[in-house]
Every structure is written in C-alpha cells, then in structure tokens.
C-alpha cells in the first residue's frame, strides 16, 4: 500500500494536515474544518484538518489509477436473490408492515495495493460529475472513500437545515412512472418527520417537490425539505433524528431497517451513509447520502460500490434489478477503465 497522507476534498476545497480524529459528533459543533464519514451501520468518523484551501479536482493522470477488470466485479446479491428480495418486500407491504423499503447490494472487485481514492475522484469528476462529489482519505483509520453522490442528506447554514431526498430514477424523464412520484412523496413525508423531531415546531417546509434533475446517464426526482434548529440543538441531535437517511431506508424507517437487515447479505458501510464536511467555525456543513460511492477495504484488498432501488407495492422485480444496473453501470465503467472520461465508452 502506498504511504498516502490524510486528505479530504469537497466543493472545490482540499483539506490536509490532519489534526485529530474522533467518533464524537459533538466535535462538529466545536471548532475547525471536519471531514465526516458515517457508515450506514452507525460508525462515525470525524477528521479535523488544519490546512484548508481552494483547489479544483485535478485532471486525471493517465495510468495513475489501476482499476479492476470489468468482469472482476461480484455482487452480494445476484439477480435471482435480488428479485426474490423484491418479492419478499412486496409481501411485507401486503402484510401492512412497511410501505416502502430500499433493497441494496454491494459490488466488490480486487483492487491494486497502490490504489488511491483521490485519483479515482479525479476520474469520476470527468466521467460522472456530481454535485456532492469528494474524497475522504484516512488510511490509518480505515476510511478511503471516493464519492460521486448526487443526493444531499443534510446541509446546515447556521440554524437552517435542508435535505434533498432523491426517489425516482430513469434514463429520461419519460421513463419516470407514477410509482416514482408516489415513492418520492412518501419519502418526503418521512424526511419531514425526521427533521420535525429536531427542528423548531412549525419550521419544517417543503419548498420543492418532485423536481426532475438531470445527471450523467439518467434523471432523478428530487425534493427539498427545510427546517430550523432550536438554539439547544446541534449536529448530535440532528444526526440522531435523521440518520440513516430516509431515502435509502424506507417507510416506516424502523420496519424498513428490520427488513433490510434480514434480506441484505453484506454490510453497506459508507454506502447509504453520510459523507461530507463541516466547518464548525462558520456553522456550515454539507453531508451527502453515500450513494454512487466507492470505498477501499484494505483488509480484503477490495474496491466496493453499492447500488440499490426503492421497493413499493408497484415494483416490478426485474425492473428494480435493471434500475440497480443503470445506477451502477457508468461508474463501474469509469472505475474499471472502460469509460473514456473525455468522451464515452471505450470499444
């Protein structure tokens, strides 16, 4: 493994000079600039950096990233197991246990010992640009993440907080179904409830509902939920109320989490967690939902990537499998060197 220095890269800034690392969310209301990685299963890593400066994502260096072969990826759930899981969730819905649940699978492939997630971030910035893209590289703490997330989990500006749940995916707007719009509204209601647990009474609003956003290779339905924190609430209370993100769990959240645990065969890790930064000095921060996200598992020598879909009563099992393939295909191609980041797929 390379001797890689700790680094974080988000929003046109790079952070170096690691000062300290903690799992205590209260640190995010203290001082300094923090990189934040919260695994879906609850492990929180907050890293404070001393040197933060403007820097665009560098251009990819040819040959710097040695990704896995395109046929090296394996899935924690194959097509048969995944579609069976969709059927099982529909049975839970019919029984009245849940209205919606997100079923995910984790893809894995061997990674070179010299792999650097920040180099992968440079490739993704060209091949799959995303509003919440970034890097967290903390090799000594088991956190090496490259994300091309399109989804806002939590943004905080002073006391104002905002979430931007995504539900509904298609190749084009014409592919979006009534099921997608209904699912988005359902998750918006869940996120409203989550923020309502911590925000001041009467401050939670929905400024935007089911807006179509275009992203590389697909479109999403995106909504905005906003609220205002009372003076006695900060990051610990906000994360307790809202984590894990509602758009990647289901509704009701507690029932969906139980069903997910029974059906999924691999931990999600950073996938579907929260990834981003907090500037405690300015009272600002931005955490993405950890989708479209790669991470390196050094213990197993694997590069991992998660993909999933929200399952409702109206779901078609094969259609949901295809949605997971659509979400993954472009990014896996970039990571495997099968996608020319300056143009398109390589022959």
Predicted segments with their positions:
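Extended alpha-helical targeting/anchoring segments
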Residues: 1-347
């Amino acid at each position: 493994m390379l001797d890689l220095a700790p680094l974080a890269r988000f929003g046109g800034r790079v952070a170096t000079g690691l000062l300290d690392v903690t799992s205590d969310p209260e640190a995010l209301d203290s001082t300094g600039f923090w990189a934040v990685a919260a695994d879906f299963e609850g492990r929180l890593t907050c890293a404070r950096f001393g040197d933060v400066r403007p820097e665009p994502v560098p251009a990819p260096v040819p040959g710097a990233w040695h990704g896995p072969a395109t046929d090296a990826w394996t899935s924690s759930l194959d097509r048969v197991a995944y579609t069976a899981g969709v059927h099982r969730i529909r049975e839970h819905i019919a029984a009245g246990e849940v209205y919606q649940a997100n079923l995910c699978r984790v893809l894995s492939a061997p990674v070179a010992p010299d792999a650097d997630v920040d180099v992968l971030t440079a490739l993704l910035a060209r091949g799959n640009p995303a509003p919440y893209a970034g890097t967290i590289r903390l090799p000594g703490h088991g956190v090496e993440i490259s994300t091309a997330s399109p989804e806002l989990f939590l943004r905080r500006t002073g006391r104002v907080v905002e979430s931007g749940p995504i539900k509904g995916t298609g190749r084009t707007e014409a592919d979006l179904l009534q099921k997608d719009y209904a699912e988005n509204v359902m998750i918006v209601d869940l996120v409203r409830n989550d923020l309502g647990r911590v925000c001041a009474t009467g401050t939670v609003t929905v400024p935007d509902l089911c807006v179509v956003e275009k992203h590389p290779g697909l479109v999403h339905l995106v909504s905005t939920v906003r609220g205002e924190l009372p003076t006695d609430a900060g990051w610990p209370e906000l994360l307790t109320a809202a984590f894990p993100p509602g758009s990647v769990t289901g509704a009701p959240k507690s029932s969906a989490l139980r069903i997910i645990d029974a059906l999924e065969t691999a931990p999600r890790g950073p996938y579907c967690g929260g990834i981003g930064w907090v500037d405690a000095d300015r009272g600002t921060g931005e955490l993405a939902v950890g989708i479209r996200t790669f991470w390196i598992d050094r213990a197993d020598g694997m590069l991992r990537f998660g993909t999933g879909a929200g399952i409702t009563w109206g779901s078609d099992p094969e259609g949901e499998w295809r949605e997971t393939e659509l979400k993954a295909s472009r990014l896996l191609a970039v990571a495997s060197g099968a996608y020319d980041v300056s143009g398109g797929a390589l022959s």
